[in-house]
Amino acid sequence: MKGALGSPVAAAGAAMQESFGCVVANRFHQLLDDESDPFDILREAERRRQQQLQRKRRDEAAAAAGAGPRGGRSPAGASGHRAGAGGRRESQKERKSLPAPVAQRPDSPGGGLQAPGQKRTPRRGEQQGWNDSRGPEGMLERAERRSYREYRPYETERQADFTAEKFPDEKPGDRFDRDRPLRGRGGPRGGMRGRGRGGPGNRVFDAFDQRGKREFERYGGNDKIAVRTEDNMGGCGVRTWGSGKDTSDVEPTAPMEEPTVVEESQGTPEEESPAKVPELEVEEETQVQEMTLDEWKNLQEQTRPKPEFNIRKPESTVPSKAVVIHKSKYRDDMVKDDYEDDSHVFRKPANDITSQLEINFGNLPRPGRGARGGTRGGRGRIRRAENYGPRAEVVMQDVAPNPDDPEDFPALS
């Protein structure tokens, strides 16, 4: 027992039992993460890499600018270069807060060359004239552009530019639709696309909303559908297109026509009766048209023309010019006998000899029990031969000729 436990095979088995396990981690759990977008992750990594490159270039540019002359600079610019010359890195919060005072005072004294870290974000109007051939300053301006995820101030500027003076004849509903953000026209996510060609930032000022803003719901009865009102007013339904003016304009035309008809009727009293009769007929026709399905079917059956067939009838009279070609083969007495006999209903020809013949049906012998199988034993066949013997002779005696009779066997000579 001890030897068995001390063997290397047992030790290996014990080690396998201790190290045995099952990995149950789900390797597809990353596919269930629907909140994060892989493209956003890639863009974020690219943005971080660009920021690192921009910081490196900005530090190099600050060091190169600090070594040059410092005369004719604004206090803000001097402080900025002094901080850069000291070797201390500017934080992202300071970079965002510094462009504000510089933007408020663009005409500051001695504002010839500003600090490279204090460049503000270019505006829409300035972006078209932006030149890339300005050396390190152009690179810094490109570095200071905000990422696509950050909030963009041109949305608020657009709302401030569109004032009531620009839309003097708008309605409250139009103002509500105008204040709403545009759907599908870019925004904080896709605003940077195509801005180099005067993209959505410039197109907003050319045409405010190119979709039409549901103008089809605000048309009542104007010139765009005037033809449609004339066509549909004859129905006089609830949903006919048109306004109250159209109905008021159409209705007075009918009363104006009635007095003319009355004057004509007064001028010609003799023509009153013919004029009234067609009106009564029209009323009757309208009443007849209102009927049920059964009444309509009955009316159709009555008005339907009946088919007339030319049916040829057999002639019962014998023509006078008829000639007997040959006499009938049937006899009258045979026909009478057939009618008298109940068992025969068919006619018999004159040369029928079936009634004169005597037909006898012989009784076949019952087969023996042994012959039921056919192949069993031989007793059945023997009995059958014995039974057939005498009966066959009796039958043959009636039919076979007599050799001694000269009538049956006449002489050959």
Swiss-Prot record:
Annotated positions of the Phosphothreonine modification: T354, T375
Q: Which InterPro entries match?
A: HABP4/SERBP1-like, HABP4_PAIRBP1-bd, IHABP4_N
GO molecular function list: ribosome binding; RNA binding; SUMO binding; translation elongation factor binding
- State where the protein is found: Nucleus; Cytoplasm; Cytoplasm, Stress granule; Cytoplasm, Sarcoplasm
**SMART domains in alphabetical order:** HABP4_PAI-RBP1
The protein's UniProt keywords, in alphabetical order, are: Coiled coil, Cytoplasm, Isopeptide bond, Methylation, mRNA processing, mRNA splicing, Nucleus, Phosphoprotein, RNA-binding, Transcription, Transcription regulation, Translation regulation, Ubl conjugation
Q: In which tissues is it expressed?
A: Highly expressed in brain, heart, and kidney, and moderately expressed in skeletal muscle. Also expressed in a variety of tumor cell lines and in activated but not resting leukocytes.
Main location class = nucleus
The reply to whether Chaperone figures as a keyword in the UniProt entry is no
- Annotated region (Disordered) at 42-206, 227-320, 360-413
Give residue numbers for the modification (Omega-N-methylarginine).
Answer: R70
Q: Where is the composition biased (Gly residues)?
A: 184-201
User: Bias category Acidic residues: which stretches?
Assistant: 404-413
Mark out the compositionally biased spans (Basic and acidic residues): 87-97, 139-182, 294-315
Ranges in coiled-coil conformation: 40-64
Q: Where is this cross-link: Glycyl lysine isopeptide (Lys-Gly) (interchain with G-Cter in SUMO2)?
A: K213, K276, K336
Regarding protein family, the annotation reads: Belongs to the SERBP1-HABP4 family.
Entry's free-text remark on domains: The C-terminal region is necessary for nucleus and cytoplasmic localization. The N-terminal region is necessary for nucleus and nuclear bodies localization. Regions containing Arg-Gly-Gly repeats (RGG/RXR-box) may be preferentially methylated by PRMT1.
Instruction: Cite any additional comment in the entry.
Output: Able to bind hyaluronan. However, its intracellular localization suggests that this interaction may not be relevant in vivo. The interaction with RACK1 is abolished upon activation of L540 tumor cells with PMA, which results in phosphorylation and exit of HABP4 from the nucleus.
Summary of the function given for this chain in its UniProt record: Ribosome-binding protein that promotes ribosome hibernation, a process during which ribosomes are stabilized in an inactive state and preserved from proteasomal degradation. Acts via its association with EEF2/eEF2 factor at the A-site of the ribosome, promoting ribosome stabilization in an inactive state compatible with storage. Plays a key role in ribosome hibernation in the mature oocyte by promoting ribosome stabilization. Ribosomes, which are produced in large quantities during oogenesis, are stored and translationally repressed in the oocyte and early embryo.
What is the annotated quaternary arrangement, including any partners?
A: Associates with ribosomes; promoting ribosome stabilization. Interacts with EEF2/eEF2; promoting ribosome stabilization. Interacts with FMR1. Interacts with FXR1 and FXR2. Interacts with CHD3 (via C-terminus). Interacts (via C-terminus) with RACK1. Interacts with p53/TP53. Interacts (via N-terminus) with SRSF9; this interaction is direct. Interacts with SYNCRIP; this interaction is direct. Interacts with MEF2C (via N-terminus); this interaction decreases DNA-binding activity of MEF2C in myocardial cells in response to mechanical stress. Interacts with PRMT1 (via N-terminus).
Q: Which PANTHER family match?
A: HYALURONIC ACID-BINDING PROTEIN 4, INTRACELLULAR HYALURONAN-BINDING PROTEIN 4
Name of the protein this chain belongs to? Intracellular hyaluronan-binding protein 4
Originating species: Homo sapiens
Protein's gene: HABP4
